[in-house]
């Protein structure tokens, strides 16, 4: 018996008879979810997820998408089809002439501690990201912000220095509670181990190195989540995660492509899902410290002709990935006219003769 569960912009499959597994790869992630397995001791209302460890949880500082999106909520969100939808903000407008965004918050927004969430919290969050002392990992996304004002508790106005087509997407960032963090050093605040957000789940316990337990937040703006409790069980090793999936100690986990074959043999017990990610791997050349690249600036592109990306995907990722020609993944803004410098040994020889005369 299966039913769909909608959880913070993600649709998962819940099953009472089947375990669901997940595979994580460099460019494609295979994701799974299960409420319980036939051999599992886990409560039917509890999801146990095999997770990497955390030392701090704070969306303004660190990019921990999985747990951040459960504990915190942003002004905007992405639905199951990755389309931008209203979240804490019920609507917004953009003035192209002045590069100004105006977001209107929903009525009755609450943090997990029962305090009101207002436009001042939004302003505080963005200013915390921009504060150089905080060394935020995501500051580059918000550097176009010129000014932030709060005409009232439900309205925040953000003026940019120039057009930024991705800005509404960047506003999926989780909003921090100003009343808990004002005047404190964000990087060392106790808050990072006891986070309070406005997302669908609130943190109830953190056993360092062992597990992080979240329980549903009844005051969540989008309604009560269907799953009562989510346990992030710390299992760093992917082989160990696979074994615990099979034993029923985990309901959901990310594993590597090479482990997919063993799960396919147990296909009756596991559901496997694949999901594209923005993750990529690359070789970065040292332009600043190399006279060679200064003399021959076109050399980096020439070297790209010698990299068989398709072969790497087939051998290293067992086909679970896609070719990346830049740090930015293919999406709705993708241009098919861009020169990709795809694998072509003949072009290397041609350029060698042109550059070096041999």
Name every feature range the model reports, one short phrase each:
Residues 20, 323-358:
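Structural transition elements
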Residues 50-96, 127, 196:
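N-terminal lobe/hinge region of extracytoplasmic solute-binding protein
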Residues 218-263:
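Ligand-site clamp/hinge motif
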Residues 90-135, 157, 293, 300:
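Aromatic- and charge-enriched surface segment that lines or borders ligand/interaction sites
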Residues 293-332, 352:
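Periplasmic-binding protein-like
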Residues 93, 97, 139-181:
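Surface-exposed binding/hinge segments that line
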Residues 50-68, 88, 115, 167-176, ...:
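A structural "hinge/loop" feature
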């Amino acid at each position: 018996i299966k039913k769909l569960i909608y959880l913070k912009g993600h649709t998962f499959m819940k099953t009472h008879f089947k375990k669901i597994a997940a595979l994580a790869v460099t460019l494609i992630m295979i994701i799974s979810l299960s409420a319980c397995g036939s051999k599992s001791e886990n409560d039917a209302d509890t999801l146990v997820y095999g997770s990497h460890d955390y030392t701090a949880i704070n969306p303004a500082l660190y990019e921990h998408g999985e747990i951040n999106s459960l504990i915190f909520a942003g002004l905007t969100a992405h639905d199951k089809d990755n389309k931008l939808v209203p979240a804490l903000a019920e609507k917004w407008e953009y003035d192209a002439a002045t590069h100004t965004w105006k977001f209107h918050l929903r009525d009755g927004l609450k943090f997990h501690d029962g305090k009101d969430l207002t436009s001042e919290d939004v302003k505080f969050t963005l200013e915390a990201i921009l504060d150089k002392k905080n060394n935020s990992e995501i500051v580059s996304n918000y550097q176009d912000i010129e000014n932030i004002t709060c005409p009232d508790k439900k309205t925040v106005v953000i003026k940019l220095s120039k057009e930024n087509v991705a800005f509404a997407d960047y506003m999926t960032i989780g909003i921090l509670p100003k009343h808990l963090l004002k005047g404190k050093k964000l990087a060392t605040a106790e808050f990072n181990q006891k986070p309070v957000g406005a997302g669908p789940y609130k943190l109830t316990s953190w056993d360092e190195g062992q597990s992080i337990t979240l329980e549903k937040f009844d005051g969540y703006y989008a309604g009560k989540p269907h799953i009562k409790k989510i346990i992030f069980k710390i299992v760093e090793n992917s082989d160990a995660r696979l074994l615990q999936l099979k034993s029923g100690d985990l309901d959901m986990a990310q594993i590597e492509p090479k482990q997919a074959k063993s799960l396919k043999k147990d296909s009756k017990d596991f559901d496997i899902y694949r999901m594209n990610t923005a993750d990529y791997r690359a070789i970065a050349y040292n332009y600043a410290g190399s006279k060679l690249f200064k003399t021959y600036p076109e050399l980096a592109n020439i070297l790209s002709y010698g990299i068989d990306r398709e072969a790497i995907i087939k051998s290293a990722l067992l086909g679970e990935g896609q070719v990346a020609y830049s740090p930015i993944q293919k999406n709705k803004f993708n241009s098919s006219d861009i020169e990709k410098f795809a694998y072509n040994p003949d072009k290397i020889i041609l350029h060698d003769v042109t550059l070096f005369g041999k």
